[in-house]
């Protein structure tokens, strides 16, 4: 069976969409974001399509597109709907990899009763945890790692995003007992070519396919 990976984060806006674009492009994968909250600046799927270089048919349609950039449970309430977690089943396996991106951080509520991490636990797919490198990331990252391990979710490792703070990265991986997958540096301008080159330089693709 082809590689199927979940990408989540220690927090919102840590850079997991940019990382997902890089990973999906490098794997020549399909990409799926089951829940999109907020659409004023375009969807994450459109951003991944632009940055990954993947053809349009590789960007799979969202199950829910919510109008408000907020926690999915609240954004759905504003739109007058409730997210049914039974709708959040990964697409059938194909002969190519699949990258699934969550919304916000691991512990973001989908509805009044379920967190995203609960859905990930049900799927039992390997998870890549994205973390920022700035002040506060040690606490956020270790709490996230503990939550993933407590639910027996297979953890591929942690991908850092941001400037180089080697000591923070080292101590997170040592205490958390997780693999350091690499660090995606800030890119300006952020272009598909620059992202592809940075990913190839910073990560070992075999770490995601083993």
Swiss-Prot record:
Residues given in the record as Mg(2+) binding sites: 17, 47, 101
Protein name: ATP-dependent dethiobiotin synthetase BioD
Location (main, coarse): cytoplasm
Gene from which the chain derives: bioD
InterPro entries: DTB_synth_BioD (IPR004472), P-loop_NTPase (IPR027417)
Catalytic activity: (7R,8S)-7,8-diammoniononanoate + CO2 + ATP = (4R,5S)-dethiobiotin + ADP + phosphate + 3 H(+)
One Gene Ontology CC term in the entry: cytosol
Sites where the protein binds ATP: 13-18, 101-104, 185-187
Family: Belongs to the dethiobiotin synthetase family.
Subcellular location: Cytoplasm
EC number of this enzyme: 6.3.3.3
UniProt keyword annotation of rRNA-binding present: no
Domain of life, per lineage: Bacteria
Molecular functions (GO terms): ATP binding; dethiobiotin synthase activity; magnesium ion binding
Entry's transmembrane regions: none
Gene3D superfamilies (alphabetical): P-loop containing nucleotide triphosphate hydrolases
Species classification: Bacteria, Pseudomonadati, Pseudomonadota, Alphaproteobacteria, Hyphomicrobiales
Needed co-factor(s): Mg(2+)
A Pfam short name: AAA_26
Function: Catalyzes a mechanistically unusual reaction, the ATP-dependent insertion of CO2 between the N7 and N8 nitrogen atoms of 7,8-diaminopelargonic acid (DAPA, also called 7,8-diammoniononanoate) to form a ureido ring.
């Amino acid at each position: 069976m082809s590689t199927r990976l979940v990408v989540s984060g220690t927090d919102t806006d840590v850079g997991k969409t940019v990382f997902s674009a890089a990973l999906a492009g490098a794997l020549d994968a399909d990409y799926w974001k089951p829940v999109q909250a907020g659409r004023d600046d375009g969807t994450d799927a459109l951003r991944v399509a632009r940055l990954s270089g993947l053809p349009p048919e590789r960007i799979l349609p969202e199950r829910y597109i919510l109008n408000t950039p907020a926690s999915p449970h609240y954004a759905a309430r504003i739109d007058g709907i409730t997210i049914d977690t039974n709708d959040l089943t990964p697409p059938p396996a194909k002969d190519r990899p699949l990258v699934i991106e969550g919304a916000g951080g691991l512990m973001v509520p989908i509805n009044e009763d379920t967190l995203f991490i609960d859905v990930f636990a049900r799927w039992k797919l390997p998870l890549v945890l994205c973390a920022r490198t700035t002040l506060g990331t040690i606490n956020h990252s270790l709490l996230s790692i503990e939550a993933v391990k407590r639910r027996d979710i297979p953890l591929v490792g942690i991908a850092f995003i941001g400037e180089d703070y080697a000591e923070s990265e080292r101590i997170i991986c040592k205490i958390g007992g997780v693999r350091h997958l690499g660090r995606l540096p800030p890119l300006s301008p952020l272009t598909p070519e620059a992202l592809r080159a940075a990913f190839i330089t910073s990560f070992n693709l075999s770490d995601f396919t083993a």
